[in-house]
Each structure stands twice: as structure tokens, then as C-alpha cells.
A protein has these predicted regions:
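Structured beta-strand-rich core segments of catalytic domains in phosphoester-bond hydrolases
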Residues: 68-149, 287
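N-terminal, active-site-proximal structural segment of metallo-dependent hydrolase catalytic domains
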Residues: 3, 9-14, 18, 22-83, ...
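Short, solvent-exposed loop/turn elements at domain surfaces
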Residues: 40-47, 66, 136-138, 205, ...
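Active-site beta-strand/loop signature of hydrolases that rely on acidic residues for catalysis
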Residues: 31-38, 53-74, 127-130, 164-211, ...
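Glycine-rich, phosphate-binding/catalytic loops in enzymes
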Residues: 51-52, 81-84, 144-146, 211-215, ...
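Acidic/histidine-rich helix-loop elements
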Residues: 35-51, 72, 133-172
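Metal-dependent phosphoester-hydrolase catalytic domains
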Residues: 107, 116-118, 185-195, 201-320
């Protein structure tokens, strides 16, 4: 009799869960957001086919990807990449996604703009994509590096102080980041998920710390203005949210082309996935790259000079 009563009890519990109102059941959905500089259309580095770039995105199991450098010597490859994935794409913002695109936001030369996508259960999210100027690049200015590959290599002013670094960074990228943040501020729903991804061509104040400078990882401590402005606007850096110790977890995205001790460059984390929104939480972040030493997910041959970053996030389902 006791066993029968226990069985009836559990059946009742399960039945109650089935008919429980949606607003009582606290469920979550998963979203993977990625930033990927594919380098000259994804067909130049190591002479890899575009399908290898698609393979990187597939390995990340991404849902939305902000792409930088879509133009190849033969033309723009964004549409072809979207076809390989079987996804939607937005030419203006250079974003590809498995979701329906319901709204477009115009950007400019470096701030690519953004889109609004329809997620499951009629939820929506916004994603904005950036590819900020690479010149002048403050780590090179501080370290006295003239990269042979850069067209502005003979037009670099060397600097020494944090104040100079911040000033030069603001001149290079301040206007574009300002445009982005004004557009984000104009979104009517202040609780909706918003993502900003891109190749920022500027390190983070969370990486260039006093501790990192004392350890010789960077020449000096710098409170870089772009990452600082993102934080002030309420955005979280997904990588540092999961890996707050900048001394232990480097998350380097620049660059698979060079060894870590190569004196002609400076290894750094300049590709980001930022997020904000009510109930939005990052659960995991992975770096995609060329080998296990430098990446969490390996695709070989790796078809870009930037490692990619993908963040897995959860958000509560829309309640009635």
C-alpha cells in the first residue's frame, strides 16, 4: 500500500509540473555569440578555401557571428559564407546568423551597424559589429614597433606614457565607439539582450593592469578608453567574466601568425564579445585557433590571422 501511495504521489507531482503555468517554470535558453575576423575574406591566410572559415564557425556551434574583413581579392565573401552555413546574413553589419533578421541598423566605415534577430519563443536580441581602426596601434607605439606588413608603418609616432596612450586611442577609435553607444542607448527596451562584438584593434583595461605590467607582459599599465567606455555603458566582457584573472588566462586573439616571443609584434586580446540585458548570463567562453597551446577549440589548418572568440549565454524564457 505504501508503495502504491508513493507512486500516486510522484504521478501527482509530475502532472502538476506539466500543467504548471509558464510564469512559474523558470526555464532558460542558450545562445552562442561569436566574433571572428576572417582575414581578407577568409581565403588568403594559408590559401585556405572559404569552407575552412565555415568550419571554424561550425566548430564553435555559434548562432550569431559578427564577421570582420569580409572583402577578399576577388570580392566580398559574406554572402557565400552564409550560403555555406545555410544561414541569413546582413551585408551592412557583416553579421551571419541562423535566426531571422527582423531589423537593420546602419553603421559606418568602422562601426558596421547591427541587426535585431528573432529568437525562440518570440524573444528578440540585438547584435552590433565593429572593426575599429588598426592605426595607430598603441601597443606598437609604446614598444617602438614598425610592422613591415602595415601600410602606415613609416607613419607611427612612438609614445611612453599611459596618458599619451589613452589620448591616441581616443583619437583613433573614440568617434566610432561613440556612434555605437548612442545607437545602443536609443533601443527602447532597456532589458533586451544586446551584444557588441568585433575586432576592436585595442586591448582591454582588464588586461593591461598594474600586475601585468610588473610581470613584464605589457610595457606599462593602461586604462584603455574603448573597453572602459563599454564597461561604463553597462556591458560585460564575456571572456573576463568567466576568466577574471588576467595573469592566468590570457585569451590571446592576436595573432596565430606569430610566436609569442616575436619582437615584431605584441600578443594581445583585441577581439571581444560584450553583452548586457536583464537575466543574461555568460556560462562559457572559448577561443578558437590553430593549436591546443593557444586555443580551446582547434581547427587545422586555421584560416585567419585572428583567433575567434565564442560566448555561450543563457537568458530566461519570456514569461506570460
Amino acid at each position: 500500500m505504501k508503495k502504491r501511495n508513493d507512486l500516486i504521489k510522484w504521478v501527482s507531482v509530475i502532472a502538476a509540473m506539466i500543467v504548471m503555468p509558464l510564469h512559474v517554470r523558470a526555464e532558460e535558453s542558450t545562445l552562442r555569440v561569436m566574433s571572428y575576423n576572417i582575414h581578407r575574406g577568409g581565403v588568403v591566410h594559408l590559401k585556405q578555401p572559404l569552407s575552412q572559415t565555415a568550419k571554424v564557425i561550425q566548430a564553435a556551434k555559434a548562432d550569431i557571428v559578427g564577421i570582420q574583413e569580409t572583402r577578399s581579392p576577388r570580392g566580398d565573401t559574406l554572402e557565400d559564407l552564409a550560403k555555406l552555413l545555410g544561414w541569413n546574413h546582413d551585408e551592412g553589419s557583416c553579421i551571419v546568423t541562423r535566426y531571422e533578421i527582423v531589423e537593420h541598423f546602419k553603421g559606418g566605415k568602422d562601426y558596421k551597424g547591427g541587426i535585431k534577430v528573432k529568437l525562440a519563443s518570440d524573444k528578440h536580441a540585438y547584435i552590433f559589429n565593429l572593426h575599429l581602426p588598426s592605426h595607430p596601434y598603441q601597443p606598437y607605439q609604446l614598444l617602438g614597433i614598425r610592422p613591415k606588413w602595415h601600410k602606415h608603418t613609416n607613419n607611427i609616432t612612438f609614445i611612453k606614457t599611459e596618458a599619451e596612450t589613452i589620448e591616441w586611442a581616443k583619437k583613433a577609435r573614440g568617434a566610432e565607439i561613440g556612434k555605437l553607444l548612442r545607437q545602443v542607448k536609443s533601443i527602447p527596451d532597456k532589458e533586451v539582450p544586446v551584444f557588441v562584438v568585433g575586432d576592436f584593434n585595442e586591448p582591454s583595461h582588464l588586461d593591461w593592469t598594474e600586475a601585468a605590467a610588473k610581470a613584464g607582459r605589457h610595457p606599462i599599465k593602461v586604462a584603455y578608453p574603448t573597453s572602459t567606455e563599454m564597461a561604463k555603458a553597462g556591458f560585460s566582457d564575456s571572456y573576463r567574466k568567466i576568466y577574471p584573472d588576467e595573469m592566468k588566462n590570457l585569451g590571446l586573439t592576436w595573432s596565430p601568425k606569430y610566436k609569442l616571443d616575436d619582437p615584431t609584434t605584441h600578443p594581445d586580446r583585441i577581439d571581444f564579445v560584450y553583452f548586457k540585458g536583464k537575466g543574461l548570463q555568460v556560462k562559457d567562453v572559448k577561443i578558437l585557433g590553430e593549436n591546443e597551446e593557444n586555443a580551446d577549440l582547434v581547427v587545422s589548418p586555421y584560416p585567419s590571422d585572428h583567433r575567434a572568440v565564442v560566448a555561450t549565454l543563457t537568458l530566461p524564457k519570456k514569461t506570460k
